[in-house]
Amino acid sequence: MAQQMSPGQHGSECIHDNAQSHLPPYVDCDSAGFRNNRSNLTLKFSSDFEKAQKAMEFCSDVCAVYFPADLDVVFNSEIENELAVDICEWRFFPCFSESLKRLAISMSRLSSLQIDLSYERRTLLHHHLVWIFLMDEVCERLPLLGLHDTMERKYLENLKNITMDLPIEDLNQYKGICPDDLLQVALDVQRILAEDLMPLKRALLEESHVQKCSETLCLFFDNQYEEGKIFFKRPTTHQIMSTRGYTIGTNMVFLLFLQTPMVDLYNADDPGLVQLSILVALFHDFIGLQKDLDSLKQDCDGSVGLNLVRVSMQESGHDEKEALQTVVRRLNSYCHGLEFFMSAYTPLCKQLYQEILKFVFALYDYHLLGATESSNSRYGWHRVSDYKA
């Protein structure tokens, strides 16, 4: 397990003028940024919308993300470390590949976000985050094997039935057709949902909350199937967008950390929540572009052709840097606009969106830093503290 790092290991940190601000130290820090192993582009964060937008006008090698100043994105290192220990003792942990084990440990950071949530609820959230990566691996590989309309359909139907406590079909009928390792992953995914996630939800959440979780998860499965149909069809941005707000999976994560009053307001088809999920998808595709391009060459993941940044490059004729800056400008404009419109919401609705937006930016942080503020090597980005504009 990664050990907690001391502040000195990151070099000099920026101190915010507002002592009450709980912005991550890389926000509004002129000397801090992130670079990818495969590019000289620098990613920076600013709580000043105009400054972020202008930074990209003056420098083609910078992407400046707007980070709203009133978001409390803080993580609890004690909880993070405890979750990291506990996930290693989870009975399903031995089922994971070495890379997924490392990912599971790093996700303890995301599950330690400073919010009003019991440790048991955090454990459920942590298990779900790990499970969704395992579940998605099956959906990414089956279309490459020509099994989308057969085994994948049955796999997703089984998962839906598990959420509704209905019988499932035995996937072993595909033994000899599907590689043994992938078949075992699919079986493990079903077991974790049936034996761990659903029992935890029923034990920790109110019945109406569990019902919303199941409905949202089934919507996710339905869109996963629809998305699999276009893996090899050179889809347009508009075709991808019709499912991506659901298949990015964040609506389910939102539900797992919300408290009852806000859960009552939650609607998986709420256009605003779908847009926030697209926000996550755009940043995910931004941060994962190089990884997806590598996977495309290796032909090991059918979903990489759906990367919205890559598709926008094909449609617009932009080079990589232009496409990345365009995506970031879109992210910034949406967030800035949302802040304005939220002022007209009811207090509870505003709180719902504020909490979800906080988690969106916690995801940004996780994608870049991973566990204990180190570096999330999954996407090839690393922190640089000596950047000069």
UniProtKB/Swiss-Prot annotation:
Motif (NDxxSxxxD/E motif): 284-292
One Pfam family per UniProt: Terpene_syn_C_2
Stored InterPro entries: Isoprenoid_synthase_dom_sf
Cystines in this chain: none
Residues annotated as binding Mg(2+) 1: 136, 140
Motif DDxx(x)D/E motif: where in chain: 136-140
Binding site for Mg(2+) 3: 284, 288, 292
Binding site for Mg(2+) 2: 136, 140
Reactions catalysed: (2E,6E)-farnesyl diphosphate = bicyclogermacrene + diphosphate
GO molecular function, a single term: lyase activity
EC number(s) given by UniProt: 4.2.3.100
Keywords, alphabetical: Lyase, Magnesium, Metal-binding
Keyword Metal-binding: yes
Keyword match Magnesium: yes
Domain notes: Contains several highly conserved motifs that are important for catalytic activity including the aspartate-rich 'DDxx(x)D/E' motif and the 'NDxxSxxxD/E' motif, both of which are involved in complexing Mg(2+) ions to coordinate the binding of the isoprenyl diphosphate substrate in the active site.
Family the UniProt entry places it in: Belongs to the terpene synthase family.
Biological role: Catalyzes the cyclization of trans,trans-farnesyl diphosphate (FPP) to the bicyclic sesquiterpene bicyclogermacrene.
Protein name (database record): (+)-bicyclogermacrene synthase TS4
Gene for this chain: TS4
